[in-house]
Amino acid sequence: GAATAKPRLDVVIRNAINDGTIVGPRYLAASQEITVPGGLGDTTAPHLPQAEFAFGAVVSGAEEMRRCVRMFCKYGVDSLKINLSGESITGMPSEMSQFTEEEIRVCVEEAKAWGKRVAAHARSTWSIKQCVKQGIEVIYHASFADEEALDLLEANKFNHFVAPGLAWLINTCHHASTWGLTPEVTRKMGYHRELEAAIESMKAMRRRGIRILPGGDYGFAWTPHGTNAKDLEYFVKLIGMSPMEALLSATAWGGPMMKMGKEIGYIREGCLADILLIDGDPLADITVLQDKARILAVMKDGEFHRAPPVRHTRANRWAA
């Protein structure tokens, strides 16, 4: 996951999947979002200031950051998530960056000392540059990437992954009126402008060979789980990927992102047998992946979790 709602929630679920208690996908157990007072993820209220009421882990200063990262590593997370920029829907503009460079440096330093991945919510220009300069591998959003940020990413493109979360932006702008987020409201928030900027940023990153991943911010009412394949359609229709490029973003790049580059992401000898069988050709129509009725089989590590139908009768076939 990108981040979790409680300190050990992802760890407990990951462990239950890995020991066979429950069925689930491979994923990196994440920390809560690490944020600052008043930042994205600080959901405490004046009358309920206790940390237990916050969605994120709230820190202020380098030493609080160090202690926070060490505690998450003690709990057994695989990755740390830090909110480097704002989020307009919470009242802090997406272009705003709230952490100091020292706080970011300590976060990455401690995470790397424990061998953990670091991911960042980074919409603002400054936050994108900090991800590259400080060594944060997984960059969520990267909407407002200027030329300097693009140059930095291109020069370090084998060290970073960008997950723009386009479906969240698109649905927030155009398909969330039921939840009070009308196009008029989201335009005032700045999301329509950000969507335009994000599409242009992703087009530029694709031209420069920067690895772009699907996923991110699914689980909202207007971006429900199980609709993740919509990202691949947007990659093709909006940022110019070929269907093959979009498929590679969802398969081949997942391995190195999860530090399992030699084990997953490909169907070949030596890799784990994680296979999706589709009734259709996504190279001809990438949207076929969104039709759940056409998912014939789901296999993880050689075990079917949805087995393909087996014909009990069929026409005779003769071999010469």
Regions found by a protein language model. Name each.
Residues 1-110, 151-185:
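Divalent-metal coordination cores built from histidine and acidic residues
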Residues 10, 39-40, 90-92, 128-134, ...:
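Histidine/acidic-residue-rich catalytic or RNA/ligand-binding cores of hydrolases
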Residues 27, 76, 80, 111, ...:
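Divalent metal-coordination and catalytic microenvironments
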Residues 107-119:
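Short beta-strand/loop segments at the ligand-binding rim of alpha/beta enzyme cores
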Residues 113, 178, 183-186, 194-281:
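His/Asp/Glu-enriched, well-ordered alpha-helical/loop segment
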Residues 129-149, 234-245:
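Structural recognition of alpha->loop->beta junctions
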Residues 132-138, 156-161, 180-186, 207-211:
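Glycine-enriched alpha-helix->loop->beta-strand junction motifs that scaffold or abut catalytic
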Residues 250-252, 269-316:
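C-terminal cap of metal-dependent C-N hydrolases
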